[in-house]
């Protein structure tokens, strides 16, 4: 594909994504006004659930609320929320947390907080987050599946031993202190900041917004396959085009979108 054709393609993608996001946001807002209001969706007294720390799988589906997952000094898994219709049920080692309310607009004061014992290692964590801020602090699991909607996402201290699958939405994604054995990341609209360690094979498809990577280790540890979109690409301070760089054991394929890409390395042997 010729450069001008790629430029047209990515501009069209950016316009389409923005248009769809606006239409969906308008439609959800209208449905929210028709079907539910904050007064009926939120309780004055938050509810709390407790579950055994032996839970191995987390399945979370929250259409519209501030969602927080974090490790704490506790012996059980606690779920707290002021959403009236939130359900939290355990079955066969799987904890399913869901707000079934349909057609709900974004509720700025709504929250869901999930606290698990420090040192917990889950087998699978599956999160479907709609409108609202998502924050994850100190989470370890074998498999991580994240489907984002609209809002900022902050992840601090994430360890994934098998594969992380992340579908971006509309909003910034900030990941730091992470250790992931292979990531399949498909960004939407928003800035991406990634700081930590990758191993195995990763595929990253960028959308609309700047992307910054600070990879643990030296450049020799990685094998980069870069296809730039619209914007500059810098690897270790050097501007590059479509290229393959390095022959390290960790392979990362990056398909650029609309926005600059910066890749730096941190480690003793930079």
What feature does the model see in each segment?
Residues 14-21, 54, 140, 198, ...:
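Hydrophobic alpha-helical segments and their boundary regions
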